[in-house]
């Protein structure tokens, strides 16, 4: 034949199930509702994705059974957003800690049109904040700050990392936070996911967890 031939695959493969939590993934495995290969691979792909594969079969192929993508709130790091939405996002999309409360307090009392830059480093800022019903004072914008955004599966500990907090006056006060840890949080998050799954599946020896 002058056309490429392909071997007919007699082994049917299931389509991947979509999930959004690690707990539902563990429940699915422990329920033993589907027949699986003797050896299975749980692959932690990223801080927001886990996949379940079979080991290689006779045709050197893997069955892709489950895809878990974390259902997380969205936050635009590195982008200035208006003051009110920033405060709401900080309260709803970040775990409480001392620095979060500090940023919230500062952002909640700053006056429009008073954000000013000073010094030679181009990083430090100051602004006028309300210190009482009728009193005001200049204050330094806190930097850097350690925050804990919800950015991996909620079943595991959320990594804390450093951020640069910036403000500007443009159609009202606008705020932004910029990641300052070089992405190191991703490795910590993936390690946390791996440990969680290893602990949950410790009695099921056919499952190997990798990242």
Question: Model-derived features: where do they sit?
Answer:
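Surface-exposed polar/charged interaction patches
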Residues: 14-17, 28-35, 92-97, 110-113, ...
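Long, compositionally biased interface segments
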Residues: 156-211
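Alpha-helix boundary/N-cap detector
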Residues: 16-20, 77-81, 85, 98, ...
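An N-terminally focused, membrane-permeabilizing/fusogenic/translocator signature enriched
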Residues: 1-53, 204-211
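A glycine-rich, hydrophobic loop/mini-helix early in the fold
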Residues: 52-80
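Positively charged, hydrophobic/aromatic-enriched amphipathic segments
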Residues: 1-23, 109-113, 122, 126-139
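Membrane pore-forming effector domains from diverse proteins
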Residues: 71-76, 112-170, 176
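Membrane-inserting effector segments that mediate pore formation, membrane fusion
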Residues: 76-126
